[in-house]
UniProtKB/Swiss-Prot annotation:
Domain of life: Eukaryota
Modification Asymmetric dimethylarginine, positions: 484
UniProt biased composition (Acidic residues): 861-880
Stretches for region Disordered: 1-27, 202-222, 318-427, 440-468, 482-604, 856-886, 1436-1467, 1542-1647
Subunit relationships: Interacts with CTTN/cortactin SH3 domain. Interacts with STRN, STRN4/zinedin and MOB4/phocein; this interactions mediate the association with the STRIPAK core complex and may regulate dendritic spine distribution of the STRIPAK complex in hippocampal neurons. Activation of glutamate receptors weakens the interaction with STRN and STRN4.
Keyword set includes Repeat: yes
Compositional bias annotation for Polar residues: 379-388, 440-466, 569-579, 1544-1559, 1567-1584
Subcellular location: Cytoplasm, Cell cortex; Cell projection, Dendritic spine
Protein name: Cortactin-binding protein 2
Residue spans of biased composition, Low complexity class: 362-372, 389-411, 488-509, 1609-1623
Length: 1647
């Protein structure tokens, strides 16, 4: 038991420990150190410290206990006093070690477990303690920061208080100042009132002065008006007196001729000669009387002439026809009579309101009154405008139209029955010209100035073949008529008493009796058959004009008579008159199968006398389609041919059809048989091919639908007939007639009181049907009979809606003028505007929007359809820009069921034109949305989107400004300050970046456009120097950009968008300012003058580097402008560097002396005395016009001081007052000069090595491309940045002006006259007038007469009059040129004019011939030059060509066998055969006559043309070679065109001047340009120039750099088309020689 009790103690004690441990575990889980407060943490820390102390005590106690236990366990087991130990010892010794369990727990293990647990707790508490310490530190730092912030807050609060105090003081001061300022304002207001009062007084005074001035102005204006009136009266009286004088002179001349003739007749009578010559006098007198123009007091003298194609009608009887009068033989006087087929403007149209009853009694045409008989240029017209009055009275309320027909009808056959004979020599040239005119051109205007073009018809679709047929018919007619005057008559004349009628019922007319037409009999000439009696039903009632009858006729263009060709359809106008016919053609018509009927009583067929075809029949026709444009002027042989339909469309309801589907040729049924003598009407209607019309029980509807006027009128005369009967579809007879466009039937039914507003089952009235089908005549009739113009069908369609839907503009206009409502909507919500836009019909939409209804009623007349066309084509376009739309904004913006407006429809279908018209209406709402929330832009196509985006875009011109240009003094009068380069489109969504990119891109494109060659591809490839074409401008050249008046730079942005900014600031343009001389740059100079910037900078560098520079070139090379701009730029550069600078300009003339130049240098501080120190001031001296004085005399003494500028090399100069002193040039002096001369001569050449020379050659940059670039920029400015296409006439005109300058200089260079070369300055003023090339030609003529011709004349005379014969020691010039020299000058001017100026002119040859007379020297006979050969001359004579800087540099004169054959030198001017090869067929005889007279005059001078010098002979030979040359490389490869250039060939007897064409591109070897050897009899002294300084320079060219001397031999290997070569002839071989300025002159001395 003791053992059990002992063993249970530990167990009993372990259970509470485990329970306490579990409780502690749960408490530990709930315990969280982070949630404890500071005080709790401190308490916990103290508790843990106490526990640590207790733990230390426990550990010490346990150590002591352990020691005791250890001793006991080790040594106590052997103690016999303790029985428990004995028992334990026995227990342990009794069993094995593994099986034994301790009796009680070992205290050491317990202690170790407790210690491990305590270590863990200690570590955990240490970590928690460290975390608590870190949080404590962070908290303390936050406290420190909080304290610092509190201190700063206090400081700021203190400062704020201080600032408030200061602000209070400032506010008090401002209040005081405001009080003071208010007092001042009051004082200023008082002063302003006083000033205003004074201003009012001044205004009153100025008003009084203005009134007095206006009164004086009125008086002066009245005086001027009186003066003008008197001047005009004087002018009128002077003209009248002149005219009277001319008439008296002409009358005197005639009387003189009569006297001479009478004298001759008296002499002949005295001699007893026969009396035949005496008969010619009255005849000629009569002829002259016929040709004379009739004045108001004279009666018209006409003469009737019958020919094979016309009917001569004479007399004034209106009741009976006059017999034909045939003269036996036309006299020359009557041959001048005008026989144009289109002499009268024929107007045969259908009289819609007049009814013709008795057609058999048609009156004969009568001659017009004296005032209407107009005699044209070619003589009196033979009954040209005959009036054919109507034989019946017009219907009441209608305007009667009198048909007018031409006396000479159109050609009735495609073939001319007689071949016109060629013009005889004895005929009058006017008749020959008329024959040539009408044979050559069928579109020429007639005698009255009218062109025979018919008005456009909607249903007419002529083909080119139809037009050719009509033109050929007119042409043949006139040819046949003229053949009566120019050739014997062919065929027998008709019997005088035979009336011009024939059997035309069963015998349709054909062209000739030999022409074959299937199914048609021939027309037999003879008396007409007896006229059968009239029908009973038609005898009393006047019937309307009948539709046309289809007649088959041969109208091909075959030249052989009798050829079998395709059938054509010809119809006559609805009148029985023989003239005024219309030729109507249609391509695909079936063969006629209608029965042949006897003629009606009203047939009046005219048979031509000599076998020509009759034009057409004027008879009644069943089922004919009326003319679409009655009342229009449609002459015979019209280009637009009407089409006779074969069928008529007929349906039960109105369906919208297109313009093509409502053409007559596309319909379904037609009765083509002519109503005549048939006993039964029903078989007549059913025969001939047409199918019976279904659903039409009555003949009335059938006749109305088919347009059978005869049947309809008969039925209407019957009693008891219901004319308003409607079929099952609701169609009445009036409806059917209106739908099919039968105007006459509609008129009959309306006169019979048919219901005008009867509707069918769909609600369509006859007016709806006519408007839908486009029958505007029916619409006009129905409106006149009070039809309801606003009637709406079941679907809401009004007549206006239907007309707009089908694009029938004539109907639309009639309805609008009648006052129809434009705002009626359909069931779907569509208005007429929707309908017009839906079909894309622009004309209909224009009418709806702009056409105004008349204020007082509607006046309808027969010429209304014609005015329709003109109003629509011309008037409406003008009204768009001037008048406002009459349509309100609500109608434009009206939406249908789907919410779509008219703009939605136009945009979605891509009808850009319609959308543009809608957008012009200010009330349009493009942002309006449909029911799907879509705007117009959302549903638009790409094109329409672009249009909508640009709708409100601002169009701002972009201009480049170069600043103010001083004009007049420096040759810059033609330069423009500003140039428009493009137009910027600024939209609402445009950003500043987009705007900046657009401006930059526009500038870049513009600079490239004016620099590149582009379409300026001239024929001469030698001028295409593209290497130096770039002018060097870029965006860096821009100084500033002005948006109106606001400066702006690229990339800068404002708060407003560009669109808002431009509108707010009212910026009308964007100006780009280029950097100019004021900024030390030359960009503006380069742009103004079109000289490349790189070259200008190079010139400026030469001035700065060498100080002495002279610019020289031909006159007009802009030397003065360049020098002045360089001086300005240099001045501003020096001023920017801190130096003062001054420009001194002096003009040199012939009287400018060296002493004056010395005074100029001294006064400007360029020449400084040796004793004086140099100044720091910069001086720029400009000497202009140095060519007017001798350079060697003027600058000879200054050469050395200018080269060496220092006090060590002084020079003594004499002043103007006579004193002299030593001076020197200082370094700060710049000297620039200008010379308007291409080369130097004589002693002046000594000056050239002391200066730096800038040569402005016309064939090199910058001058060569300057004119091209300048004119291109001028053109771009004219077209506001949009350069036209190369095919535009204005581009060709500019090309011509450019080529004139180049070819002119090339020809002048070849003639050896460099002093006549011109710079581009004179051509800068070339006018750029689009569409008026005549202005440029007139300008060119003025330039030629004022500048070019005098210079050429002076240069040629100075060269031709210089003699260098051995007997004379010096050069002499003749004051009065000989006749030979004058001939040479005239020849040179004429050749230059033809080869350089007139060649390539864009005007037609006929217009150019009119302007040729304005050019001086254009009438010289050039063939004289071609046949001229100079007299004998010496071979070794000195060369006359002193200098030449042209591209065709001259070699020495070669004495080759070709130029010096003995037979040629002896021949002189023996050959007088004139080979004037001007192949211009339009040249008048008078010009040729004057040319021959001039030529004969020159030939009379031939014996005296022995030229006194060899230079004249050289000139003549040079002119001859220029005339014969056709492959000149330096004249832009002038084409061998006989029409554009007058070429000249020498005769066969003169082989020396036969044009030997050399190959200008043949390579030349080095031997050919070497110095000439001894066997060559050529002297090239003027080519050589020294290269050694010791040899004096006698003759030279202006300078070429010495570095180029070595390149000369290589340059000569190039082709001769280059600008430095020339063609010469040596033994028929093409050889050439380069002229160089620095060749070795010793070769010249050896020769």
């Amino acid at each position: 038991m003791a053992t059990d009790g002992a063993s249970c103690e530990p167990d009993a004690s372990r259970a509470p420990e485990e329970a306490a441990g579990a409780t502690a575990e749960a408490a530990r889980k709930e315990f969280d150190v982070d949630t404890l407060s500071k005080s709790e943490l401190r308490m916990l820390l103290s508790v843990m410290e106490g526990e640590l102390e207790a733990r230390d005590l426990v550990i010490e106690a346990l150590r002591a206990r352990r020691k005791e236990v250890f001793i006991q366990e080790r040594y106590g087991r052997f103690n016999l006093n303790d029985p428990f130990l004995a028992l334990q010892r026995d227990y342990e010794a009794g069993a094995g070690d593994k099986e034994k369990k301790p009796v009680c727990t070992n205290p050491l293990s317990i202690l170790e477990a407790v210690m491990a647990h305590c270590r863990k707790m200690q570590e955990r508490m240490a970590t928690q303690l460290a975390a608590a310490e870190s949080r404590q530190k962070k908290l303390e730092m936050e406290k420190l920061q909080l304290q610092a912030l509190e201190q700063e807050h206090k400081k700021l609060a203190a400062r704020l208080e201080e600032e408030r105090g200061k602000n209070k003081q400032v506010v008090l001061m401002l209040v005081k100042e405001c009080k003071q300022l208010s007092g001042k304002v009051i004082e200023e207001a008082q002063k302003l009132e006083e000033a205003m009062a004074k201003l009012e007084e001044e205004k009153k005074k100025t008003n009084e002065l203005e009134e007095e001035l206006s009164a004086e102005k009125r008086r002066s204006t009245e005086m001027e008006a009186q003066m003008e009136k008197q001047l005009s009266e004087f002018d009128t009286e002077r003209e009248q007196l002149r005219a009277k004088l001319n008439r008296e002179e002409a009358h005197t001349t005639d009387l003189k001729e009569e006297i001479d003739k009478m004298k001759k007749m008296i002499e002949q009578l005295k001699r007893g000669s026969d009396s035949k010559p005496s008969l010619s006098l009255p005849r000629k007198t009569k002829d002259r009387r016929l040709v004379s123009i009739s004045v108001g007091t004279e009666g018209p003298l006409t003469r009737s002439v019958a020919c094979q194609t016309d009917l001569a009608i004479e007399g004034t009887d209106h009741v009976k026809k006059s017999p034909l009068t045939v003269p036996g033989k036309p006299s020359p006087g009557s041959a001048k009579g005008s026989v144009c087929a289109n002499a009268a403007h024929v107007r045969p149209g259908m009289d819609r309101q007049a009814s013709h009853g008795d057609l058999t009694g048609s009156s004969a045409p009568s001659l017009p009154p004296a005032s209407a008989n107009r005699i044209e240029e070619n003589g009196p017209s033979t009954g040209s405008t005959a009036d054919l009055p109507s034989s019946t009275a017009p219907a009441p309320g209608s305007a009667a139209q009198s048909p007018v027909a031409a006396a000479l009808g159109p050609a009735h056959s495609a073939q001319s029955p007689c071949t016109p004979a060629p013009a005889q020599p004895g005929l009058n040239p006017r008749v020959q010209a008329a024959r040539f005119r009408f044979q050559g051109n069928a579109n020429d205007p007639d005698q009255n100035g009218n062109t025979t073009q018919s008005p456009p018809s909607r249903d007419v679709s002529p083909t080119s073949r139809d037009n050719l047929v009509a033109k050929q018919l007119a042409r043949n007619t006139v040819t046949q008529a003229l053949s009566r005057f120019t050739s014997p008559a062919v065929g027998a004349a008709p019997r005088p008493g035979a009336p011009p009628t024939g059997d035309a019922g069963a015998y349709p007319p054909v062209g000739r009796t030999s022409l074959k037409t299937p199914g048609v009999a021939r027309v037999d000439r003879g008396n007409p058959p007896p006229i059968p009696p009239k029908k009973p039903g038609l005898s009393q009632t006047p019937s309307p004009p009948h539709p046309q009858l289809k007649v088959i006729m041969d109208s091909s263009r075959a030249s052989n008579a009798g050829a079998k060709v395709d059938n054509k359809t010809v119809a006559s106008p609805p009148s029985s008159l023989p003239q005024g016919n219309r030729v109507i053609s249609e391509e695909n018509l079936p063969k006629s199968s209608s029965p042949q009927l006897p003629p009606k009583p009203s047939i009046d067929l005219t048979v031509a006398p000599a076998g020509c075809a009759v034009s057409a029949l004027a008879t009644s026709q069943v089922g004919a389609w009326p003319a679409e444009t009655p009342g229009l002027n449609q002459p015979a042989c019209s280009d637009s041919s009407l089409v006779i339909p074969t069928t008529t469309a007929f349906r039960s309801s109105i369906n919208p059809v297109s313009a093509s589907s409502c053409r007559p040729g596309a319909s379904d049924s037609l009765l083509v048989t002519a109503s005549g003598w048939s006993p039964s009407l029903t078989p007549l209607l059913m025969s001939g091919g047409p199918a019976p019309l279904a659903g039409r029980p009555t003949l009335l509807q059938q006749a109305a639908a088919q347009g059978n006027v005869t049947l309809l009128s008969m039925l209407l005369n019957e009693e008891g007939l219901d004319i308003n009967y409607s079929c099952e579809d609701g169609h009445s007879a009036l409806y059917s007639a209106a739908k099919n466009g039968h105007t006459d039937c509609v008129r009959l039914l309306l006169n019979a009181e048919a219901q005008v507003n009867a509707a069918d089952k769909n609600g369509f009235t006859p007016l709806c049907a006519a408007a839908a089908q486009g029958h505007f005549e029916c619409v006009e009739l129905l409106i006149a009979y009070d039809a309801n113009i606003n009637h709406a069908a079941d679907g809401g369609q009004t007549p206006l809606y239907l007309a707009c839907k089908n694009g029938n503009k004539e109907c639309i206009k009639l309805l609008l003028e009648a006052g129809t409502d434009r705002s009626v909507k359909t069931r779907d919500g569509w208005t007429p505007v929707h309908a017009a836009v839906d079909t894309g019909n622009v004309d209909s939409l224009k009418l709806l929007m702009y056409h105004r209804a008349p204020a007082h009623g509607n006046s309808l007349n027969e010429e209304e359809p014609e005015s329709d066309v003109s109003d629509l084509d011309d008037g409406e376009e003008s009204s768009e820009g001037e008048s406002k739309p009459v349509v309100p904004a609500d109608l434009i913006n009206h939406a249908d069921r789907e919410g779509w407006t008219a703009a939605h429809i136009a945009a979605s279908k891509g009808f850009k034109n319609c959308l543009e018209i809608l957008c012009r209406h200010r009330g349009l709402e493009p942002e309006r949305r449909d029911k799907c929330n879509r705007t117009v832009h959302d549903v638009a196509t790409d094109d329409c989107k672009h249009l909508l985006e640009n709708l409100n875009a601002l169009k701002i011109p972009l201009r480049i400004s170069v600043g103010e240009i001083q004009s007049g003094n420096y040759g810059s009068s033609d330069f423009e300050c500003e140039n428009t380069i493009c137009v910027l489109h600024i939209r609402k969504q445009t950003s500043w970046d987009d705007f900046s990119k657009a401006v930059s891109q526009a500038l870049t494109n513009h600079f490239q456009a004016i620099s590149s060659d582009g379409w300026w591809s001239l024929e001469d490839t030698a001028f295409n120097n593209t290497a130096d074409s770039d002018i060097g401008l870029s965006l860096d050249s821009v100084r500033a950009i002005m948006l109106g008046s606001v400066p702006w730079s690229a990339g800068q942005s404002f708060t407003q968008s560009p669109w808002d900014f431009m509108r707010k600031n009212k910026a009308e343009q964007v100006t780009v300012l280029l950097s100019g001389p004021q900024e030390g740059c030359l960009s503006s100079v380069a742009y103004a003058s079109m000289i490349p910037l790189q070259m200008l900078q190079n010139y400026l560098r030469l001035v700065e580097q060498y100080h002495n520079v002279i610019f020289h070139g031909p006159e007009g090379s802009l030397q003065d402008y360049i020098v002045h701009q360089l001086a300005l730029c240099l001045k501003h550069r020096q001023m920017a560097a801190g130096f003062s600078c001054e420009i001194v300009r002096a003009e040199v003339d012939a009287g400018f002396s060296k002493e004056q130049l010395v005074d100029l240098f001294i006064s400007s501080a360029c020449l400084i005395p040796v004793k004086q120190s140099p100044v720091k001031k910069k001086i720029i001296i400009i000497l202009e016009n140095l060519e007017k004085s001798s350079l060697s005399e003027l600058l000879g003494d200054f050469l050395a001081p200018l080269e060496i500028r220092s006090p060590e090399s002084p020079c003594t100069f004499q002043k103007g007052n006579g004193t002299s002193e030593c001076y020197y040039f200082h370094e700060n002096c710049f000297l620039m000069g200008t010379i308007a001369k291409a080369c130097l001569q004589g002693a002046d050449l000594l000056v050239q090595q002391h200066f730096r020379w800038v040569q402005l050659r016309w064939d090199g940059e910058p001058m060569h491309g300057l004119l091209q670039r300048f004119l291109r920029r001028k053109l771009v400015n004219k077209f506001r940045g949009q350069a036209p296409s190369p095919c535009d006439p204005v581009c060709k005109t500019i090309d011509w002006a450019l080529s004139v300058w180049r070819q002119l200089n090339s020809c002048l260079a070849r003639l050896g006259t460099p002093e006549a070369l011109l710079g581009p300055k004179y051509f800068l003023s070339c006018p750029v007038v689009p569409g008026h090339a005549q202005a440029t030609v007139k300008w060119m003529s003025k330039l030629w007469n004022a500048v070019i011709a005098p210079r050429v004349q002076e240069a040629i005379l100075s060269r031709a009059s210089v003699k260098r014969q051995p007997g004379f020691g010096q050069t002499t010039t003749k004051k009065h040129p000989s006749q030979g020299q004058q001939a040479v000058v005239k020849a040179a001017l004429s050749i230059l004019l033809n080869k350089a100026v007139l060649h390539g002119c864009p005007l037609p040859r006929a217009e150019l011939d009119q302007h040729t007379a304005d050019f001086k020297g254009g009438s010289f006979p050039l063939s004289l030059v071609s046949n001229y050969n100079s007299c004998s001359k010496k071979k070794e004579n000195g060369a006359w060509r002193k200098v030449n800087t042209s591209p065709r540099r001259k070699s020495g004169r070669f004495s080759s066998p070709t130029w010096n054959k003995p037979d040629l030198s002896n021949e002189g001017i023996k050959n007088k055969t004139i080979s004037q090869l001007n192949c211009n067929k339009n040249a008048s005889l008078s010009k040729q006559k004057s040319l021959e007279n001039d030529l004969s005059l020159m030939l009379n001078l031939d014996p005296r043309l022995s030229l006194g010098s060899d230079d004249e002979a050289d000139l003549v030979k040079e002119l001859q070679s220029m005339c014969s040359s056709k492959s000149e490389s330096d004249i832009s490869k002038i084409a061998d065109s006989r029409d554009d250039l007058r070429t000249f060939d020498s005769s066969g007897n003169n082989p020396a001047f036969s044009a030997t064409v050399n190959n200008p591109r043949m390579p030349v070897s080095q031997k050919e340009v070497s110095p000439l050897s001894s066997h060559q009899t050529t002297e090239c002294s003027n080519n050589k120039s020294k290269t050694e300084p010791g040899v004096s320079r006698v003759k030279s060219f202006l300078p070429v750099p010495r570095s180029k001397v070595t390149q000369c031999s290589q340059n000569t290997k190039r082709s001769s088309s280059s600008s430095n070569t020339r063609q010469i002839e040596i033994n028929n071989n093409s050889k050439e020689e380069n002229w160089n300025l620095h060749k070795n002159e010793q070769t010249h001395r050896k020769t």
